[in-house]
């Protein structure tokens, strides 16, 4: 947006809010929320906790995924009438999996000034504490709820060399980590981060397989909001099925059923059964084929 072309209008401020700890908000953000003419909130009731905490009495209106297109037209009119508006989401930085995209583009269409304010973001907070490279990364949002769609996404990023960030909901975390193991491998390093900045915050880095074991042993850790950080593809670590594994499988396969041989071999080498099974099938190692 060329500053010379901006007419005398109001300003749309994009204001991040805390992702858990109410202290994680800047003085500048509070000052803006106190002095704008209107706050466009994703959920007014939810945002009142923060606004009351800082004695922010500014009028609020709702802007969410269901009303964004209609509400944006009203907000644009107010901005044109020199009203300053702050956009906030339930937590974190607006537009990161939250409403606001349509409104921002309407501001560009109507040459209205946009001012982004730095602040909290769950994805970045998890990334910087993940112990994984943060110089190059990609953000993929929420993993799909349906397994077929989720596996399709994981296959697409299987050879992505950058660090990968996903969000996930609590009731699907076991299924999603299992899919990560089966598609990206049991030794892919991931960082599991939940309840960031809150009392029960926990950050755990390990192989995907060990994270799954840890989760199953610590059921309460599945409660809360989750960020999954996945290490990028490294072809040095992709051959997880060693010659010793294949040799063991070959010997067992001559005496046992294919499925039984898979189960025992996986147990010996602490590999997920599904991962070893899929490897065997994809490399033409089956009930009626020898191992080459």
Swiss-Prot record:
InterPro entries given in the database record: 4pyrrol_Mease (IPR000878), 4pyrrol_Methylase_sf (IPR035996), 4pyrrole_Mease_sub1 (IPR014777), 4pyrrole_Mease_sub2 (IPR014776), rRNA_ssu_MeTfrase_I (IPR008189), RsmI_HTH (IPR053910), SAM_MeTrfase_RsmI_CS (IPR018063)
Places the protein is found: Cytoplasm
Keywords tagged on the record: Cytoplasm, Methyltransferase, rRNA processing, S-adenosyl-L-methionine, Transferase
Main location: cytoplasm
GO cellular component: cytoplasm
Any one Pfam family match given in the protein's UniProt record, by short name: RsmI_C
HAMAP family per UniProt: 16SrRNA_methyltr_I
Name listed for the protein in its UniProt record: Ribosomal RNA small subunit methyltransferase I
Gene responsible for this protein: rsmI
């Amino acid at each position: 947006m060329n500053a010379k072309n901006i007419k005398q209008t109001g300003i749309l401020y994009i204001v991040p809010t805390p992702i858990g700890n109410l202290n994680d908000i800047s003085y500048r953000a509070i000052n803006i929320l106190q002095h704008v003419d209107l706050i466009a909130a994703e959920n007014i009731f939810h945002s009142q906790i923060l606004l009351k905490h800082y004695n922010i009495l500014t009028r609020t209106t709702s802007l969410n995924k269901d009303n964004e297109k209609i509400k944006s037209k009203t907000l644009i009119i107010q901005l044109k009438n020199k009203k300053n508006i702050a956009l906030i989401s339930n937590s974190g930085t607006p537009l990161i999996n939250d409403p606001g995209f349509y409104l921002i583009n309407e501001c560009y269409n109507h040459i209205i000034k946009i001012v982004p304010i730095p602040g909290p973001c769950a994805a970045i907070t998890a990334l910087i504490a993940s112990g994984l490279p943060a110089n190059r990364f990609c953000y993929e949002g929420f993993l799909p709820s349906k397994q077929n769609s989720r596996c399709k996404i994981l296959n697409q990023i299987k050879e992505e060399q950058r660090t990968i960030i996903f969000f996930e909901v609590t009731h699907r975390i076991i299924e999603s980590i299992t899919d990560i193991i089966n598609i990206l491998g049991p030794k892919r390093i991931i960082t599991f981060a939940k309840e960031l900045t809150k009392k029960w915050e926990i950050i755990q880095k390990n192989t995907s397989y060990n994270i799954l074991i840890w989760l199953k042993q610590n059921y309460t850790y599945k409660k809360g909001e989750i960020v999954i950080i996945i290490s990028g593809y490294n072809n040095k670590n992709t051959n997880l099925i060693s010659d010793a594994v294949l040799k063991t499988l070959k010997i067992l396969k001559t005496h046992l059923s294919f499925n039984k041989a898979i189960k025992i071999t996986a147990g010996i080498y602490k590999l997920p059964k599904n991962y070893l099974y899929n490897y065997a099938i994809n490399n033409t190692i089956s009930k009626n084929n020898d191992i080459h």
